[in-house]
Amino acid sequence: SLVVLDTRQSHLLACQERHRAGLAVGLELELHALRALEVVDVEEQALLPKGRGKFPDKPFVVLVVGVNGAGKTTTVGKLAKNYADAGNKVLVAACDTFRAGAVAQLDVWADRAGVDIVRAQQGADPASVAYDAVKASLNREIDVLLVDTAGRLQNKTNLMEELKKIQRSIGKQAPQAPHETLLVLDATNGQNALSQAKEFDEV
């Protein structure tokens, strides 16, 4: 499951301040804070449009981003299976050409989901892989293209610029794409998750 933080941070901060001061929080404030945390079961409530033929544009391109070790490749694998099980033609793009074993890991997930994969040698230009994946998707009449990317720290300018290059490569053949960008976060990040979200949102 995922824990989604609502925008009502003020309630959570107020609870923290009263706890630090040794004061009672109060039932109403606690309820507000609890409502600000929404637990979403990914298996029961799809994050994205589900079912074949329900996408405004095809391929429906989903770019998956995040820092190192957050679980991007695993997320791509699970989404691929979800979409394939719903009857969609799915293709995954292995644009993490930096991490050793990243392509092999995505290969395993693609095989489990029964979907095809576009890959390149380690060290290849990830933007080129993304371009080839969109081209292949158009030729094969793919419904959903899932783009896995290398982990990158949000404060590393050159890596964030690389992400922009990937987006531009995707948009050359599919002007409205990527249609969705998913930021995968580690649930233990705390307030750093907000910093990551802001930085990735600016890309």
Could you describe each region identified by the protein language model?
Residues 97-98, 150, 187-188:
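Conserved Walker B
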Residues 7-10, 14, 21-24, 33-36:
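Short linear motifs in low-complexity or flexible loops
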Residues 105-106, 125-140, 154-203:
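Conserved catalytic-core segment of NTP-binding enzymes
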